[in-house]
């Protein structure tokens, strides 16, 4: 933290900042360890957009670099896509204060997007694809072994629901990804971090935020709707978002319906199998007692103490 920022923050704000930094550092460290994101000798290319997420990612990675059990390099990279009004001086000035190696690339993808996308339509998808292609190529040029992007936990969950609602796929953003050509490994160190923590951290750190709407494009309405839905859930049902993310880490293909993930076709009964594992329904005395009190629950272990009526088998039929 710079002395300027320290001087401008109150004691309460400084305490809060330190607490947030500790939490984000712990979450980023856990994500890196869980997915083996950064290894000994890695050159990590941190893609910096000028938004709160990428600023926070770079800040935390620099902090972790000083105490990490492995040695790795950090190179910050920003792509100036020639959007009108883009403040070219902001990022270089900020990065110089950090003393971290950086590159500012220039490529006029803005004109390409405006030429291809009809007026009034969202340009974000094409813009991001063009940006990704440029960054992938530059990563190979500078010998980067990892490309770090600033997507956080909320981005990952939003993408899951977007693909479910509009794409018919159970697909999100993986914390670690190998590019289609196998030439680049993409990592998302903020995968365990909440957006609201990042936003508060960025505000307290006073990062020089560059707005992402310089192109004039409106936010993707579908993503905005999903974001609002998740925010409402978070307010009304605290802990639900955490549970969703935990569920994404604990999938059970054999309990789903995706034939590509599990071979249901080949499932056969083993005539020699011995009973083991969970008790089958046939072995439970589910109909030995009737709930005459209509309480909705029968305690089979204590059935003798309850008001119950024995159900007898009075007849059988064999075709």
From Swiss-Prot:
Q: Could you list the residue ranges that cross the membrane?
A: none
Which keywords describe this protein according to UniProt?
4Fe-4S, ATP-binding, Cytoplasm, Iron, Iron-sulfur, Magnesium, Metal-binding, Nucleotide-binding, RNA-binding, Transferase, tRNA processing, tRNA-binding
Cofactor(s) the protein requires to work: Mg(2+); [4Fe-4S] cluster
Q: Give any GO molecular function from the UniProt entry.
A: tRNA binding
Give compartment(s).
Answer: Cytoplasm
Query: Where does this chain carry the motif PP-loop motif?
Result: 49-54
| Entry binding sites for [4Fe-4S] cluster | 124, 127, 215
InterPro entries named in the record: Rossmann-like_a/b/a_fold (IPR014729), TilS/TtcA_N (IPR011063), tRNA_Cyd_32_2_STrfase (IPR012089)
Keyword Iron-sulfur in record: yes
Q: Which SUPFAM superfamilies does the UniProt entry name for this protein?
A: Adenine nucleotide alpha hydrolases-like
Pfam families xref list:
ATP_bind_3
Q: Which PANTHER family match?
A: AMINOTRAN_5 DOMAIN-CONTAINING PROTEIN, SULFURTRANSFERASE-RELATED
User: What more is known?
Assistant: The thiolation reaction likely consists of two steps: a first activation step by ATP to form an adenylated intermediate of the target base of tRNA, and a second nucleophilic substitution step of the sulfur (S) atom supplied by the hydrosulfide attached to the Fe-S cluster.
Q: How does it assemble?
A: Homodimer.
Q: What is this protein called?
A: tRNA-cytidine(32) 2-sulfurtransferase
* Organism from which the protein derives: Shewanella amazonensis (strain ATCC BAA-1098 / SB2B)
């Amino acid at each position: 933290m710079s002395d300027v920022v320290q001087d401008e923050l109150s004691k309460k704000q400084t305490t809060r900042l330190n607490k947030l930094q500790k939490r984000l550092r712990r979450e980023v460290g856990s994500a890196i360890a869980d997915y083996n994101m950064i290894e000994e000798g890695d050159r990590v290319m941190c893609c910096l957009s000028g938004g709160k997420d990428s600023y926070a990612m770079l800040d935390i990675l620099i902090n972790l670099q000083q105490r990490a059990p492995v040695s790795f390099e950090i190179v910050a990279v920003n792509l100036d896509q020639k959007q009108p009004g883009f403040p070219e001086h902001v990022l270089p000035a900020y990065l110089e204060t950090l003393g971290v190696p950086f590159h500012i690339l220039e490529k006029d993808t803005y004109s390409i997007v405006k030429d291809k996308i009809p007026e009034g339509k969202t340009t974000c998808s094409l813009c991001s694809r063009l940006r990704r292609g440029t960054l992938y190529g530059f990563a190979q040029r500078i010998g980067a072994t990892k490309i770090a992007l600033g997507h956080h936990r909320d981005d990952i969950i939003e993408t899951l629901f977007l693909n479910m609602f509009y794409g018919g796929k159970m697909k999100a953003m993986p914390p670690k990804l190998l590019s289609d050509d196998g030439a680049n490994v993409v990592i998302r160190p903020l995968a365990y971090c909440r957006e609201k923590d990042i936003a508060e951290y960025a505000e307290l750190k006073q990062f020089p935020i560059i707005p992402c709407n310089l192109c004039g494009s409106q936010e993707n309405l579908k993503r905005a709707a999903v974001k609002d839905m998740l925010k409402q859930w978070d307010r009304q049902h605290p802990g639900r978002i955490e549970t969703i993310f935990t569920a994404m880490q604990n999938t059970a293909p054999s309990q789903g319906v995706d034939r590509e993930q599990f071979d249901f076709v080949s499932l056969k009964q083993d005539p020699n199998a011995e009973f083991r594992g969970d008790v089958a329904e046939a072995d439970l005395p589910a109909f030995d007692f009737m709930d005459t009190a209509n309480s909705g629950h029968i305690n089979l272990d204590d059935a003798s103490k309850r008001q119950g009526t024995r159900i007898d088998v009075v007849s059988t039929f064999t075709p």
